[in-house]
């Protein structure tokens, strides 16, 4: 969910200082409500940094916006206004500033309009050794949902707790929830083919987006009011949710197959190897 990179240094020098960068944008949410969609976009980008082990208090943002031509229609003007207000509210709540951005306000061609779009990019510094990858690491570990409750007295309390556990070496993997717990668990299972079994007393909607929330694999059980135990990692490469089971390999094939025709990852068996030439003619004034 993030891009992590060491900071560049002079030759013969070394550093363990790195940066993590992530984005957030839900086109459906923005079309339904530009204010809430933009607010969620900011939170989604920062939540991914938190899931990677970064401190959200050190994050900065840059925003990219696309909107239809505004003309003289109040409803059209209201869309970017609402979106920017939502993004600003999120920044004030998080204490994270957007230090740059690009406004693309000409998203209209004849009678075609782009949907309201605000993409949040977040970046934060981190020690390279603290970067946390999202795939499940080991069978038999408890998996928790850290609930980012916008209505709580301390909305970022779950993020603070997760960071505390990470600093103590008790977090093995984490993923910021975007499209529901089922999608989250599936993606976390792919990397090491480690399965997941839902707990017997879990009563929640596995296919509803939970902005601000993070699913994490821990090394031990915890008792925290904003952490819900979802289940346990398993050695068997199978995901079991609500009595339904699916092999990880089948889910991975379906997941990768969506864009296989657009961006092929495998060459056909009879595909010839082409020889490419980069020779070009050199023209001079003579």
Segments from the language model and where they lie:
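A glycine-rich phosphate/pyrophosphate-binding beta-strand-loop-alpha-helix module
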Residues: 32-107
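Intein/HINT protein-splicing elements and their conserved insertion hotspots or analogous self-processing inserts
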Residues: 1-18, 22-30, 75-82, 97-210, ...
